[in-house]
Amino acid sequence: MHAHWQRHYRDTDWLLVSHAGTPVGRLYLSRWAREHRIVDIAFLPEHRGQGLGAALLQDLLDEAARAGKSLFIHVEKMNPAMSLYRRLGFVKESEEGVYDLMRWSA
């Protein structure tokens, strides 16, 4: 899977998300001239619902705000994390099949 992301998203940073020294998830993030985009974010099932995703997203929002850029993410319409994105201020920019493109602006 990682090889796919490296091949198709060469300008994307890959980050291993850790908590208390334990790997808990991954993040693929593109920082483009006009925007930042979360290409992929995932947490291991046993580490979901503990506020780790919210904390990571808040760090990304803070970074985007400092850079004066919007932050985008494609989210499956039925993804339980959709409520988290909305709570953090993301709004639907467009619909693309089973995905909504969500945008956060400073």
Regions found by a protein language model. Name each.
Residues 35, 64-76:
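Conserved GNAT acetyl-CoA-binding A-motif
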Residues 88-89, 104-106:
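Structural recognition of alpha->loop->beta junctions
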Residues 49-62, 82-87:
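Conserved acetyl-CoA-binding loop-helix of GNAT-fold acetyltransferases
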Residues 44, 48, 72-82, 98-105:
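Conserved beta-strand-loop-alpha-helix junction that forms the acyl-donor binding cleft
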